[in-house]
Amino acid sequence: MQHIGVVFGQRTQLWWDLPVVESFELLRSIYGVSPGAYKARLAQLVEQLDLGSFLDTPVRQLSLGQRMRSDLAASLLHNPKLLFLDEPTIGLDAVSKLAVRAFIRELNAQHGTTVILTTHDMDDIEALCTRVMVIGDGAILSDGPLEALRKTVHSERDLIMDLERDVEVDERDVRIIKQENQRVHLRFDPALISTPALIGRLTARYPVRDLFVENPPIEEIIAQLYRQRAIE
């Protein structure tokens, strides 16, 4: 356990009635971290996770975002090489989610910590993961880079186009997902028509004010993978 850290989004490892810092002291003793190493590590984590204002607050009085940041710090006091995160952003507001994700990215980049993340939040996957494993009915359905999953399961891309005025859009080689007023949502396969070619064709035919291209939401890709495997 010296090289492993664990955080559960719905269960804390901190002592409910103790101030945060006293829970940290107990964990320091459990993991056998020397006082000097603990002091340096704690100072670093307090700064990175902005814990200073509630270190002396009992855990039961913390907000969910504060508790999650405290749990992250607790799991890292012994500087583990492997960190397991189970639903680390569940229930968090937008600001807290961004802060937690930024910290996890920094942890991996600066310290080389391997992070294994389980989540139902697809935004967590897109923001944090370089390798994605999809599991269904106890079996591994996909294992590899996120971009490879996109290409294998769902090769299409989305193009969102804002027009200067209301115009009916009718195009070959593309599907019109939705058209609301001057905004048109198209989906196309780059294997059939390249992105530059499609953009050139659209801007020549329609009064385009703005447009952008993006990948379909990761939720759609995962759902399509489950549907494909169900058919098989």
Where are these regions (language model features)?
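Conserved ABC ATPase signature
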Residues: 17, 58-62
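Conserved ABC ATPase "signature" region
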Residues: 25, 29, 37-54
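Hydrophobic anchor residue at the start of the ABC signature
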Residues: 72
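Conserved catalytic motifs of ABC-family nucleotide-binding domains
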Residues: 79
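Catalytic Walker B motif of ABC-type/P-loop ATPase nucleotide-binding domains
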Residues: 83-87
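ABC transporter nucleotide-binding domain
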Residues: 101-189
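Short, charged/small-residue-rich alpha-helical element at the C-terminal edge
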Residues: 157-228
